[in-house]
Amino acid sequence: MRKIIITFAAAAYAFVSYAHTHKNHSLDRQTKIVAITILAEARGEGEAGMYAVGACIAQRAFERKQTPTEVCLKKWQFSCWNGKSIKDLEHLLKTPQAKYAITVAKNV
């Protein structure tokens, strides 16, 4: 697990500059879902909180042999998705915290 977290942290760090120039409209579905989950669950908790949600998604996906999308959208896993669609939450990708969340999401 330590190896996964270290690898995840290194990858996230490497892509920070990329996230600052990335356009949200060109994100693939999985990146959008993971980034939205991170934002909905922890955008007020700073980068450490958002990173923790991303690490949680990555760990669950690894342990359960599921995709990050499956982990995020599984019923009762992340309350932000209960009764909601991507369209309902996509506005979160326009928040100031979105750049970092996208960076983390691309590395989950």
Locate each region found by the language model.
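Intrinsically disordered, low-complexity segments enriched in polar/charged small residues
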Residues: 7-8, 65
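Hydrophobic h-region of N-terminal signal peptides that target proteins for export
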Residues: 8-18
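Positively charged n-region of N-terminal signal peptides that target proteins for export
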Residues: 1-4
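Bacterial extracytoplasmic/cell-wall-associated proteins, especially those involved in peptidoglycan
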Residues: 20-108
